[in-house]
């Protein structure tokens, strides 16, 4: 029986593709295990949503593009992570490793290479992240979500496969969503998602604008961990730090979304044809990948995008009003999108690429 090790973490986007592929592997009779960080969001997501598979925590350090004393400390964490991962891989003896990226994936990929375990990696963003750039040196193949990403990668290793969407995404139950929120079915719902880390500025602007927003919408506000404000209580407004199992039901009642610009989330909204206002992480918080993503989807006519540093209470309302006026056009543009690979087709490709 073929056994597959999965890795990836640090943000929801570095886990979501794995959450789609692991059930496919299990349904086809393969064994699966997960290697992630000790305290990252991937551990919480995997252990809660896929409790039937083994989760192995390893040491991991952050990879930085700038000079910092923390880099020296994290070198030792990465080295420890390689040893941790080797120990797991020698014990489990997987036939292949699938890496979704993120800092924790690098020591796992290096360990797999040292044991001659073929590795496939996945890049969701328009331009490759630092972790995947390093991991690619030790991997057999890299799959890309955007066709344009191939321009940044060696041709012999890179394949465009498009977005991989969770199977349960389209199975959200609107009745359950209304029951969960207590919302009125006859009024539009706005979902605000600041990403797995949250956005203090976006949260502040939403709360500042709440009375104006509630005139047009009912608002579901995913604030990010530790950023919920218990003092803000209004009819038609509900806050969560983070939603796991119920997210598909909330998406089923969502008419419009304000979101960070991680590509996995964007493709989910695109699949569900939910008009989106994208507020990407700025260059002060990231390498600019979300800015590239947001501009790409805005250029396609699937979304509107605004830089967080330009965002004000007035501009937010203005952008939402413009998007509502263009709702029909945006949704029609979204209808032109077609998924390149189903998760089953991608899984079959993985097995063929890794083991042949």
Swiss-Prot record:
The keyword Membrane applies. It is a peripheral membrane protein. Disulfide bonds: none annotated. Keywords: Cell cycle, Cell division, Cell membrane, Cell shape, Cell wall biogenesis/degradation, Glycosyltransferase, Membrane, Peptidoglycan synthesis, Transferase. UDP-N-acetyl-alpha-D-glucosamine binds at residues 166, 196, 290. Pathway: Cell wall biogenesis; peptidoglycan biosynthesis. GO terms for biological process: carbohydrate metabolic process; cell division; cell wall organization; lipid glycosylation; peptidoglycan biosynthetic process; regulation of cell shape. GO terms for cellular component: plasma membrane. It is an enzyme of class 2 (transferase). Its EC number is 2.4.1.227. It catalyses: Mur2Ac(oyl-L-Ala-gamma-D-Glu-L-Lys-D-Ala-D-Ala)-di-trans,octa-cis-undecaprenyl diphosphate + UDP-N-acetyl-alpha-D-glucosamine = beta-D-GlcNAc-(1->4)-Mur2Ac(oyl-L-Ala-gamma-D-Glu-L-Lys-D-Ala-D-Ala)-di-trans,octa-cis-undecaprenyl diphosphate + UDP + H(+). InterPro entries: GlcNAc_MurG, Glyco_trans_28_C, GlycoTrans_28_N. It is found in: Cell membrane. NCBIfam families: PRK12446.1. Belongs to the glycosyltransferase 28 family. MurG subfamily. PANTHER family: UDP-N-ACETYLGLUCOSAMINE--N-ACETYLMURAMYL-(PENTAPEPTIDE) PYROPHOSPHORYL-UNDECAPRENOL N-ACETYLGLUCOSAMINE TRANSFERASE (PTHR21015:SF27), UDP-N-ACETYLGLUCOSAMINE--N-ACETYLMURAMYL-(PENTAPEPTIDE) PYROPHOSPHORYL-UNDECAPRENOL N-ACETYLGLUCOSAMINE TRANSFERASE 1 (PTHR21015). HAMAP family: MurG. Cell wall formation. Catalyzes the transfer of a GlcNAc subunit on undecaprenyl-pyrophosphoryl-MurNAc-pentapeptide (lipid intermediate I) to form undecaprenyl-pyrophosphoryl-MurNAc-(pentapeptide)GlcNAc (lipid intermediate II). This is UDP-N-acetylglucosamine--N-acetylmuramyl-(pentapeptide) pyrophosphoryl-undecaprenol N-acetylglucosamine transferase. The lineage of its organism: Bacteria, Bacillati, Bacillota, Bacilli, Bacillales. The gene is murG.
């Amino acid at each position: 029986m073929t056994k597959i090790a999965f890795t990836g973490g640090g943000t929801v986007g570095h886990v979501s593709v794995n959450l789609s592929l692991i059930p496919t592997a299990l349904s086809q009779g393969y064994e699966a295990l997960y290697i992630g960080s000790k305290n990252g969001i991937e551990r919480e997501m995997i252990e809660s949503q896929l409790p039937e598979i083994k989760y192995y925590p390893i040491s991991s350090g952050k990879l930085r593009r700038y000079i910092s004393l923390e880099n020296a400390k994290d070198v030792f964490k990465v080295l420890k992570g390689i040893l941790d991962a080797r120990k797991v891989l020698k014990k489990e003896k997987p036939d292949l490793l699938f890496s979704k990226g993120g800092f924790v994936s690098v020591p796992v990929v290096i360990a797999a290479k040292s044991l001659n375990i073929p590795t496939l990696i996945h890049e969701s963003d328009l331009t490759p992240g630092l972790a995947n750039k390093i991991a690619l040196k030790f991997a057999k193949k890299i799959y890309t979500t955007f066709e344009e990403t191939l321009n940044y990668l060696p041709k012999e290793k890179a394949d465009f496969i498009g977005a991989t969407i969770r199977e349960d995404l389209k199975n959200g139950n609107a009745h359950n969503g209304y029951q969960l929120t207590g919302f009125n079915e006859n009024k539009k719902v706005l979902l605000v998602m600041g990403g797995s880390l949250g956005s203090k500025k976006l949260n502040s602007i939403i709360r500042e604008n709440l009375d104006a927003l509630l005139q047009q919408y009912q608002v579901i506000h995913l604030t990010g961990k530790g950023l919920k404000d218990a003092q803000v209580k209004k009819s038609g407004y509900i806050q969560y730090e983070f939603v796991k199992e119920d997210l598909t039901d909330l998406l089923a009642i969502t008419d419009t979304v304000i979101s960070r610009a991680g590509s996995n989330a964007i493709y989910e909204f695109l699949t569900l044809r939910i008009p989106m206002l994208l507020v990407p992480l700025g260059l002060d918080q990231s390498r600019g990948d979300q800015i590239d993503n947001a501009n790409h989807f805005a250029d396609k006519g699937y979304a509107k995008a605004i830089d967080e540093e330009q965002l004000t209470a007035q501009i937010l309302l203005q952008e939402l009003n413009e998007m509502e006026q263009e709702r029909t056009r945006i949704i029609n543009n979204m209808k032109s999108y077609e998924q390149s690979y189903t998760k089953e087709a991608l899984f079959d490709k993985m097995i063929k690429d890794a083991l042949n």
